[in-house]
């Protein structure tokens, strides 16, 4: 509710299948919303406000140039993503922020539906639609970001480290 007061154009979509399928199920629910839009993972804190720009001229995915990573990354040629993989050398570590122009957004709408409904499709990450399964339909540019621009929060303790207002909460038990 706090976000809606500050940003009344935000639309929240509840995915009751999030425990049963991979994140492609969430993308499938909003597949018609990708045109001229940013997509952001919910576990990111943006420290550089210039990450979100008023104008984008081509579809892109944020990545940080690294020598080695065991995280999701992509290779590129002439600034275009050529391959997504888990772990790599001399590549771009993938950050969960991307932008899609109108043409790519239209293609994403149909490609997500196609992949979602194929055998094994519900186990895919949505990014695999554009960066792997249907990659020949797209020219996704690498948009480079740097250390300190974005922080990923994977645990409650990591959240408490950057936001002391959560210190009053005790450790969550399973």
Locations of regions flagged by a protein language model:
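Short, motif-level signal for alpha-helix interfacial/capping segments enriched in acidic residues
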Residues: 18-21, 79-80, 133-135
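Conserved alpha/beta core of the MobA/IspD/sugar-nucleotide pyrophosphorylase nucleotidyltransferase superfamily
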Residues: 94-174
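Short, conserved catalytic or adaptor-binding loops enriched in Gly and charged residues
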Residues: 4-6, 75-76, 132-134
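Conserved beta-loop-beta/alpha segment of the NTase-like Rossmann-fold superfamily
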Residues: 4-71
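Conserved beta-strand segments of alpha/beta enzyme cores
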Residues: 9-11, 80, 139-141
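Conserved core of the sugar-phosphate nucleotidyltransferase
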Residues: 47-120
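A conserved acidic beta->alpha catalytic loop
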Residues: 1
């Amino acid at each position: 509710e706090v976000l809606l007061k500050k940003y009344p154009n935000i639309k929240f979509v509840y995915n009751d299948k999030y425990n049963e399928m991979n994140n492609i199920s969430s993308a499938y629910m909003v597949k018609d919303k990708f045109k001229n839009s940013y997509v952001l993972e919910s576990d990111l804190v943006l420290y550089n406000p210039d990450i979100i720009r008023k104008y984008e001229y081509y579809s892109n995915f944020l990545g940080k140039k690294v020598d080695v990573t065991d995280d999701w990354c992509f290779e590129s040629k002439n600034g275009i993503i050529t391959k997504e993989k888990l772990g790599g050398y001399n590549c771009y570590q993938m950050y969960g922020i991307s932008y899609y122009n109108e043409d790519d957004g239209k293609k994403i709408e149909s490609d997500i539906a196609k992949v979602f409904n194929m055998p094994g499709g519900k186990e895919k990450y949505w990014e695999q639609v554009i960066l792997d399964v249907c990659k020949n339909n797209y020219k996704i540019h690498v948009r480079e970001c740097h250390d300190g621009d974005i922080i990923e929060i994977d645990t409650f303790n990591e959240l408490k480290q950057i936001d002391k207002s959560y210190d009053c909460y005790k450790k969550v038990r399973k």
